[in-house]
Amino acid sequence: MQASELTPKWYVAPVSIKDEAVVKNLKAKIQALGFNHEIVDVKVLKEREVHEEVYSLKSGKLPRSLKNTTFNKWFVLDDYRYLRVKISEKNLLGRYIYIKMIYSEDAWRIVRNFPGITGIVGSSGRGALPIPLDEKDANNLEQMLKGISINPSKRIMLTNTAIIEMDSDKFDEKFQYILKQKQAIQKPKEDEDSEIVDAEKLKEAFKKLQNSQEQDEWKEKATIIQSEQTKLDPSVLVPFLGKYEILDTDNKVEQLFEFSVGNLVEVHLTDTIHVQGQIKALYQGTVNKAVVEIELTSKTQLINLPLENLSFVEFE
């Protein structure tokens, strides 16, 4: 066999199911069979996209969730507007993945018979062999695997299964979304009619949107007591065992909740707004309240609220 035939080449393979699942499972299969030297790498090429949506205090609509996640970020723009950034990633080739391998009958058999892979480009027809990428495209792919995009306006993030390309003016060196200064200082239009989310001023938002009775209920149930930097007084905080009546359909039932510091809980701010948080402290005596750390938009807050506003997080 000639030396050129022992050099791994990049091939393109169409997939019929989720691309990254195929890549992950194929890598595991290659490892299990000991074919790492023949099938060198498998990757999907993706592009990260951003969808921005501004929520306004004037609309009166509150989002169901205020939680920051990897692909969902909240930012405070000003006293009235809040920015939701939804991040998504799509396959730049559609339903195709890249496979780097030294072609052999065995390697080809592993790839073409793998669940989710429907062939390799160029291999259709009796006796046809797969066609590798041309030198230019292969070199571009190798450059991206070094974290360098062929487009100077793009940034590259590498994972075990993917090469992810993104705009460098939207994501920093740590691949975090960049909030533009002009977004933060832009004032809302008087006729703006979008939706609302709040961070530091969540309480004020509720006051403006609810009637006076609901305002009093909110004020009683949950008030922001201090920032995350403020220290709690441990002398008044101890683990607590509470027993409360809760409404289950049309019947009142008693349910025992045993909360401890460190528990991950669901915080019921209103009937429709629930966020997850972690118990940082529990009050001594008959106060029956907890200090819970929650994340609203890009801010972390400690709130003080009754234990009946908490429930344990249910994991599927």
Swiss-Prot record:
Described function: Participates in transcription elongation, termination and antitermination.
Name of this protein: Transcription termination/antitermination protein NusG
Gene3D superfamilies: NusG, N-terminal domain
Entries under PANTHER family matching the protein: RHO-INTERACTING TRANSCRIPTION TERMINATION FACTOR NUSG, TRANSCRIPTION TERMINATION_ANTITERMINATION PROTEIN NUSG
GO BP annotations listed: DNA-templated transcription termination; regulation of DNA-templated transcription elongation; transcription antitermination; transcription elongation-coupled chromatin remodeling
CDD domains linked to this entry: NGN_Bact_1
Any one GO cellular component localisation term in the record: cytosol
SUPFAM superfamilies for the chain: N-utilization substance G protein NusG, N-terminal domain
Species, as recorded: Mycoplasma genitalium (strain ATCC 33530 / DSM 19775 / NCTC 10195 / G37)
Keywords: Transcription, Transcription antitermination, Transcription regulation, Transcription termination
Pfam family, one: NusG
Family, per entry: Belongs to the NusG family.
Lineage: superkingdom: Bacteria
InterPro entries the record matches: NGN, NGN-like_dom, NGN_dom_sf, NusG-like, Transcrpt_antiterm_NusG, Transcrpt_antiterm_NusG_myco
